[in-house]
Design a protein with these regions (language model features):
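Glycine/tyrosine- and acidic-biased, solvent-exposed loop/turn segments at the edges of beta-strands
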Residues: 20-86, 151
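Short beta-strand segments enriched in hydrophobic/aromatic residues
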Residues: 61, 108-112, 215-217, 236
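Activation corresponds to long, low-complexity, non-globular regions
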Residues: 81-101, 107-116, 261, 267-346
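Secretory/extracellular carbohydrate-interaction modules
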Residues: 83-183, 334-345
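Short, aromatic/His-centered strand-loop micro-motif at the edge of beta-sheets
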Residues: 186-208
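Carbohydrate-binding surfaces in secreted/extracellular proteins
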Residues: 203-243
C-alpha cells in the first residue's frame, strides 16, 4: 500500500538520474529547488541555476522581511503575480480503509478574518470518491450560480451569493443529479470536464464549522442506474445553526467512501501579487465516518510547480494545520508536475 501511495503522487518517476548523465548546457540550465546564503546575511529559497538565484523564489532579509518573485543571475526582476486558479497547497491523505458511508464529517477552524477581496476556496473535501464518482466541496469567499439547469445547460442569469458553501461532482451534466437547497443555486458545465454543482449562501468568517456529507433516503434513476442523494451540511458553531448547501446524486444505494482523499486551498478568479497576500491560518481536523474517528496513516503536502511555495502545512494526530500568505522555505522534493513534502507515513 505504501508503494501505491508513492506511485499515485507520481513524484519519484523522473527523479532518478542516469548512471552517466551528460554535462548540463550552461546556456540553457535546468532550474533546481534549493537554498542559498549570502554575505549580507540574506538567504534564498527557490529555483537555482548554476549556483545563482534564477527562477521563482523568495529572498529573506536579516530584518525579517522578504520578497517573492522572479530572479535571474542573483538579481530580482519582478514580484510574482499568481494566475488563477492556484492551489496554494494540497494535502493528499489516505484513510486506513474504505468505508460504507452514512456520514463523512470534519471540523474546519478559520483562525483569521478572511477579506472579501480574496477569492479563496477552502475544500476540506478536495477530492473524495463515492462508488467511484469523484466529488469535491467546501466554502468560498465569492460564489454564485444559476437558478436551474435545463437539458444539461445553465438557465437564466448568474446569481452572485458572496460567501457560500459549494458541493460538486464530476461525470454528469444532468439536472436530476442535483437538488438545490432553499435559496440555493446550481451549475452544470464542462470547463472542468462534465460536472454539476450546488451552492448556497453561508456567511462564514473567523470561527469553527463542521462540514458533513450526509447520505439521504432520497433516490433517483439516472442513466438506468439508481442513485442516492448526498447532502452537504455546514454547522456554524458560533451561530449554533446548520446550513444546507444542497444535494447531489451518486450511483448506488450503498455508498462506499474511497481511502484516498484530498484537501486544497485555492485562489481563483483574480490575479494576485503574492507579496501582498494576507497571512491566514486554518485547521482541518476531526475527520469522522458515520460519527467515528478515522485513522490517517499517510499525508503529503503538494505544491504546484511554476508557483512559489507560499503556504505551509503540518499534520499531527489527525490535525492538519495550514498557513497561507507566507513563504515556505522548508525543503521540498521535486516530482513530475508538482513538488511535495511527506508529512506522515506509517
Amino acid at each position: 500500500m505504501k508503494k501505491q501511495w508513492i506511485l499515485w503522487i507520481g513524484l519519484l518517476i523522473g527523479m532518478i538520474s542516469p548512471l552517466h548523465a551528460q554535462e548540463e548546457n550552461p546556456m540553457e540550465p535546468t532550474p533546481k529547488l534549493g537554498t542559498l546564503t549570502f554575505e549580507d546575511g540574506s538567504t534564498y529559497s527557490g529555483e537555482i541555476e548554476l549556483g545563482q538565484m534564477s527562477g521563482i523564489g523568495t529572498q529573506y532579509f536579516p530584518d525579517g522581511t522578504w520578497r517573492t518573485g522572479h530572479f535571474q543571475d542573483n538579481k530580482y526582476l519582478a514580484d510574482f503575480i499568481a494566475k488563477p486558479p492556484w492551489h496554494m497547497v494540497g494535502l493528499d491523505f489516505m484513510l486506513d480503509r474504505e468505508y460504507i458511508m452514512e456520514t463523512f464529517s470534519m471540523d474546519l477552524k478559520v483562525l483569521n478574518d478572511v477579506p472579501d477581496s480574496l477569492q479563496l476556496y477552502i475544500a476540506p473535501f478536495g477530492t473524495s470518491e463515492l462508488n467511484g464518482t469523484q466529488l469535491y466541496g467546501g466554502i468560498q469567499t465569492q460564489c454564485g450560480g444559476y437558478y436551474s439547469v435545463i437539458k444539461g445547460e445553465n438557465s437564466g442569469r448568474f446569481i452572485p451569493l458572496g460567501r457560500a458553501v459549494i458541493f460538486s461532482r464530476w461525470g454528469t451534466r444532468a439536472s436530476l443529479a442535483l437538488k438545490k437547497a432553499e435559496g440555493g443555486v446550481c451549475e452544470s458545465s464542462g470547463y472542468e470536464d462534465d460536472f454539476v454543482s450546488v451552492r448556497n449562501t453561508l456567511k462564514w468568517n473567523k470561527g469553527t464549522y463542521t462540514i458533513t456529507l450526509v447520505k439521504t433516503k432520497e433516490t433517483v434513476m439516472l442513466d438506468s442506474v439508481l442513485h442516492t442523494y448526498v447532502e452537504m451540511q455546514v454547522y456554524d458553531h458560533k451561530k449554533k445553526q446548520t446550513f444546507s448547501g444542497g444535494s447531489l446524486a451518486f450511483p448506488g444505494t450503498t455508498l462506499t467512501l474511497n481511502q484516498r482523499n484530498y484537501i486544497f486551498f485555492e485562489l481563483y478568479g483574480k490575479r494576485v501579487n503574492v507579496n501582498k497576500l494576507p497571512h491566514l491560518k486554518f485547521v482541518c481536523e476531526n475527520y469522522r465516518v458515520n460519527g467515528n474517528p478515522v485513522e490517517i496513516p499517510f499525508v503529503a503536502s503538494i505544491y504546484e510547480k511554476n508557483y512559489p511555495s507560499y503556504a505551509d502545512a503540518t499534520y499531527n494526530e489527525g490535525k492538519f494545520k495550514i498557513e497561507l500568505g507566507k513563504p515556505n522555505g522548508k525543503p521540498l522534493t521535486e516530482g513530475d508536475g508538482m513538488n511535495y513534502r511527506m508529512l506522515n507515513e506509517k
